[in-house]
Regions:
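Conserved beta-strand hairpin/beta-sheet module of binuclear metal-dependent hydrolase folds
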Residues: 1-19, 97-109
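Short, flexible active-site loop motifs that bind/organize anionic cofactors or intermediates
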Residues: 2, 45, 120
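Active-site neighborhood of phospho(di)ester-bond hydrolases with catalytic His/Asp-centered motifs
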Residues: 2-3, 22-29, 37, 48-52, ...
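Short beta->alpha junction loops/turns
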Residues: 5-8, 30, 123, 153
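Active-site HxH/HxHxD metal-binding segment of metal-dependent hydrolases
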Residues: 7-82, 162-166
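Metallo-beta-lactamase
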Residues: 64, 82, 87, 93-169
Length: 169
């Protein structure tokens, strides 16, 4: 599984080596997360996965390329571990985090970072919606769950959710 194929397919293909890639997963449709997804899909013979609510964003970068839809609760099996899609709108309408309970991890894209929620100043973003996604979806995960973010350092659910009231204020 490759998350958020953004800038240059070559180094990603080299890092994958000869391993089988189940999917090229886009946590959301902003261009900095999807730029080389079709190219990687072709090079790795793996489908691009994206939530359908981000179709409008996808089409801004890839008007003639299709993707396979992923919805809340969908699962993928990767290297013997199950990952479950959690639809977390707010940063974009189709933002999706991927929870791997056996690995005690969640891949949050731009929904949650060390220090708080993802930015909501971009088109199709909404601050109250991202707060709801974090509190009702990510906030229910165990506190020790490691959050691998779309940009920057990792954190944990517990380290972030304690600041929820500050974000709302």
């Amino acid at each position: 599984m490759v998350f958020d194929a953004a800038h240059d397919a070559g180094p990603i293909v080299l890092a994958v080596g000869g391993r089988h890639v189940v999917a090229v997963v886009c946590t959301h449709g902003h261009n900095d997360h999807v730029t080389v997804a079709p190219q990687l899909s072709e090079a790795l013979d793996a489908p691009v996965l994206l939530h359908p609510a981000d179709d409008v964003l996808w089409r801004m970068t890839h008007p003639d390329k299709d993707f396979r839809t992923v919805n809340d609760g969908d699962t993928l099996r990767v290297a013997g571990h199950e990952l479950r899609a959690i639809h977390t709108p707010g940063h974009s309408p189709g933002s999706v985090c991927w929870h791997a309970p056996e690995l005690n991890a969640v891949f949050s894209g731009d929904t949650l970072f060390e220090g708080g929620p993802g930015a909501t100043g971009r088109s199709y973003s909404d601050f109250p919606t991202i707060l709801t996604s974090i509190s009702e979806k990510l906030g229910t995960l165990p506190g020790e769950t490691v959050v691998y973010t779309g940009h920057g350092d990792s954190t944990t659910i517990g380290d972030e959710i304690v600041h929820y009231d500050e974000w709302v204020a």
